Swiss-Prot record:
Residues 326-496 form the tr-type G domain. It is found in: Cytoplasm. Residues 116-126 have a biased composition (Acidic residues). PANTHER family: TR-TYPE G DOMAIN-CONTAINING PROTEIN, TRANSLATION INITIATION FACTOR IF-2-RELATED. Belongs to the TRAFAC class translation factor GTPase superfamily. Classic translation factor GTPase family. IF-2 subfamily. GTP binds at residues 335-342, 382-386, 436-439. The gene is infB. Residues 49-58 have a biased composition (Polar residues). Residues 382-385 are annotated as: G3. One of its GO terms (molecular function) is translation initiation factor activity. This is Translation initiation factor IF-2. Residues 65-74 have a biased composition (Low complexity). It comes from the Bacteria.
Length: 828
């Protein structure tokens, strides 16, 4: 009996109501390894709570594992029921959101920190108790395994137990780690007390798993992931970029370096391609467009060919119909010299300009704007009438809307009048004929009209389309009719222009003024020119610094048909050049350089080429053609151009006129230096030399001539050229002699006894010996005697003795003609 009772399994009981430890034990010590433990067994009981908040709060209130005096079977039943509830609850929470993970993790950490690990010493003699407990433990393990083996989805989240690192699903799971130790009792070393760590993202990754087999694998840290991403990024940067094929613009000539940059290719690659074509070039050398196109095409790039002249393609958009506004007509006044053109303008604008002009003739173009009583405006351009200003008249006709041809009633049609008519017809503009000076007595207006018929200018009264208006500029007769005619024609033409956009127009005149630099008179034809705009006019460019109108008042902008004077250009442009507003100064500079290059090439191409004979004559100093070098300086470009054109038209078969330099502005020291080096004459038209230039001219003995009227200048230059011409040698017959007898005198030679049959014979005169009407000899008379005495001359009807220089082949019956050589000054 007793043995049977002893062999029965006994219930596990505790001496106290609470399970306690004699020594303190940190909860984190459970993670330590128990390799050194030999005589003691550490048991840690931790609970992981999940599910309803009621259960969690209940466990939190308890705060520790309660071990009462209940029996082991009650404890087993309690744990079993808790595990079953956890399994049921986990099924309900399979689709719970991952957002609750952070809350559960923090709760589990707080619970783990509150539970105390339990250290129990078990006696080796408790084998019987183990046998009793084994069936129950096996049953508990089966339930735990069934709970853990529930189907797992991707969204299943596992929580890592803080005790030994195993992961459990949401639910309650308790594990006991029992290590049998040897008899020698060794207590694990007490760990350092550490503060509870703050929850980090790495803890979140540690608590999340996708596979049961990854229970013991560690999750990659954020630093590792970051390093991997940086490595991938570096690899992508190291990879060669994809080649970009471009469309490049090729000029006629391009440098190899610029060509490579345009294609974004290495210069070495371009040079290799050129070497394949048999061209050896470095980065600084240039290649033609055809070669560049071959290389670019081979490298896969598209090519767009452009001409060098494309730099002048200044974009001007077409004006919209709604932007067009009515503008004032531009009227050009033409006619012969002194027919009253400027006086007519004086009467129209009530100013006295003619009195300030030398010789009563207009030396350069003037542009004026006249506002009538009704508010309408007319822009007048006055052109010179002298024949030297033909180019200026042609420019005036090219920019005008209406041409007024002034004809003096007492003088009629003159050469410049005909030229003005031809210019107007060539420009295809309406013509108004103003017969001026009708206030003079003894005039015949009908005679002037009949002369106009010869040039196809037919008045309206004769059935034509030309308005002929008799006026008097001095007495202001019929000026109102002239203005009405201008406005009527302008209204019929429907003159309009857009005041919007970039300005463009034409240069009327240009000059250099001391202290102000280059001054240019312009007529705006389109858009609005503003102060500060960058313009290009011919080869001159620059920013508009200041604008003044025809009355000398500074303005900030100029609209179409408004003449203005600007300053700010690099140099004076040519009259008649078109001006345009560009966006940048670089664009203006490129255009100006291209135009200068073209003008230089054109000048070289039209220069007369010297023959080989001329070069030899020039080298030997025996050139037959003489040369007159000139330097021309004037006040305005139009006058300088007119003077140069007139001088070059002079005959130059024997004297060649060479204009070394022509410019606008006063005579400078550089002009004097150039004249001294080339033995030239300086001609100043309405300009003077500065003090330094005068001193230099006196020192270098350079001739400077000043003029204010173009007639005087042309006449003087003609006289200088005429003086350089070789004189004309003319032969003048003075008499005839008949040889009647030949005398041989010792030491003298043959003497011809002669008789003067006609005229007179002089000693030293030229003689021509004729035999049978054939000239045998031509020379000079060496000896003239009468009765053994030397005489200067012998008249008709007298006898004399004559002898020739270096010639004695004379016979009786020969005839001698006597003549004189007369030099006459040659004129151009």
């Amino acid at each position: 009996m007793t043995d049977n009772q002893e062999n029965k399994p006994k219930k596990l009981t505790l001496s106290n109501t609470k399970l306690s430890l004699n020594k303190s034990f940190d909860s984190l010590a459970s993670t330590q390894s128990f390799v050194n433990a030999k005589s003691k067994t550490l048991v840690e009981v931790r609970k992981s709570y999940s599910g309803s908040t009621t259960t969690l709060s209940l466990n939190k209130e308890k705060g520790s594992l309660e071990t009462g005096s209940s029996s082991g079977s009650e404890e087993f039943n309690r744990r079993l029921s808790i595990l079953k509830k956890a399994a049921e609850q986990s099924k309900l929470n399979d689709n719970s959101q991952i957002s609750t993970l952070s809350k559960l993790a923090s709760i589990n950490q707080s619970i783990a920190s509150q539970e105390d690990p339990i250290e129990v010493e078990q006696e080796e003699s408790s084998d019987t108790n183990k046998v009793k407990e084994e069936p129950k433990i096996e049953e508990v393990k089966d339930i735990e395994e069934s709970t853990l083996q529930t189907p797992k989805k991707k969204e299943d989240i596992f929580v890592k137990s803080p005790l030994v690192g195993t992961r459990t699903r949401y639910g309650i799971e308790s594990e006991k780690t029992v290590d049998k130790v040897t008899e020698n009792k060794v207590i694990a070393p007490k760990p350092k007390v550490e503060e509870s760590r703050k929850f980090k993202k790495t803890d979140l990754f540690n608590m999340v798993g996708d596979d049961e087999n990854d229970n013991r694998n560690r999750t990659r840290s954020l630093a590792s992931i970051k390093r991997a991403r940086e490595k991938e990024k570096r690899k992508s940067l190291v990879q060669a970029p994809e080649k970009v094929y471009r469309e490049i613009t090729l000029p006629e000539v391009i440098g190899v370096g610029d060509f490579a940059n345009a294609m974004s290719e290495r210069v070495s690659d371009v040079i290799k391609e050129l070497m394949k074509l048999g061209i050896l070039a470095n980065a600084s050398q240039t290649i033609d467009a055809d070669t560049a196109e071959l290389v670019a095409t081979h490298l896969g790039h598209a090519v767009k060919r452009v001409q060098e002249s494309d730099v002048e393609n200044i974009l001007i958009t077409n004006d919209k119909e709604e932007d067009l506004r009515s503008r004032a007509p531009v009227v050009t006044v033409m006619g012969h010299v002194d027919h009253g053109k400027t006086s007519l303008l004086d009467a129209l604008k009530s100013t006295d300009v003619a009195s300030g002009e030398t010789g009563g003739i207009t030396q350069h173009i003037g542009a004026y704007r006249v506002t009538l009583a009704d508010g309408r405006a007319i822009t007048f351009i006055d052109t010179p009438g002298h024949e030297a200003f033909s180019e200026m008249r042609s420019r005036g006709a090219g920019v005008t809307d209406i041409v007024i041809i002034v004809v003096a009633a007492d003088d009629g049609i003159k050469p410049q009048t005909v030229e003005a008519i031809n210019h107007a017809k060539a420009a295809n503009v309406p013509i108004i004929v103003a017969i001026n000076k009708i206030d003079k007595p003894d005039i015949d207006i009908e005679r002037v009209k009949n002369e106009l018929y010869m040039y196809e200018i037919i008045g309206e009264e004769a059935g034509g389309d030309v308005m002929v208006i008799p006026i008097s500029a001095l007495k202001k007769i019929n000026l109102d009719k002239l203005e009405e005619a201008i406005l009527l024609i302008a209204e019929m033409q429907n003159l309009k222009a857009s005041p919007f956009g970039s300005a463009s127009g034409v240069v009327i005149e240009s000059k250099i003024e001391k202290g102000r630099g280059a001054l240019t008179t312009m007529l705006v034809q389109r858009g609005t020119l503003k102060s500060g705009d960058i313009i290009i006019a011919g080869t001159a460019y620059g920013k508009v610094k200041k604008m003044t109108n025809d009355k000398g008042i500074e303005v900030l902008e100029a609209t179409p048909s408004v003449p203005i004077e600007i300053q700010g250009l690099s140099h004076v442009p040519h009259a008649g050049d078109m001006f345009n507003v560009v966006q940048t100064e670089k664009q203006a500079k490129d255009i100006a350089e291209y135009r200068e290059r073209v003008a230089k090439e054109k000048k070289i191409s039209i220069a007369p080429r010297s023959s080989l004979e001329d070069l030899f004559l020039k080298a030997s100093g025996s050139s037959k053609i003489k040369e007159l070098p000139l330097i021309i300086k004037g006040d305005v470009h139009g006058s300088v151009e007119a003077i140069a054109g007139s001088l070059l038209k002079l005959p130059n078969d024997e004297v060649k006129l060479r204009i070394l330099h022509s410019g606008v502005g006063p005579i400078t020291e550089s002009d004097v230096s150039l004249a001294h080096a080339s033995s030239a004459i300086i001609v100043g038209f309405n300009v003077r030399a500065g003090a330094n230039a005068k001193t230099a001219a006196e020192k270098e003995k350079v001739e400077i001539r000043y003029y204010s009227i173009i007639y005087d200048l042309l006449d003087d230059v003609k006289a200088i050229m005429s003086g350089m011409l070789d004189p004309i040698i003319r032969e003048q017959y003075i008499g005839s002699v008949e040889i009647r007898q030949i005398f041989n005198i010792t030491k003298i030679g043959k003497i011809a006894g002669s008789y003067v049959t006609r005229g007179i014979i002089k000693k030293g005169a030229g003689v021509r010996l004729l035999r049978d009407n054939i000239v045998i000899h031509e020379g000079k008379l060496k000896t003239l005697k009468r009765f053994k005495e030397e005489v200067k001359e012998v008249r008709e009807g007298y006898e004399c003795g004559i002898a020739f220089e270096n010639y004695e082949d004379i016979r009786e019956g020969d005839t001698v003609e006597v003549f004189e050589l007369i030099q006459e000054k040659k004129q151009l």
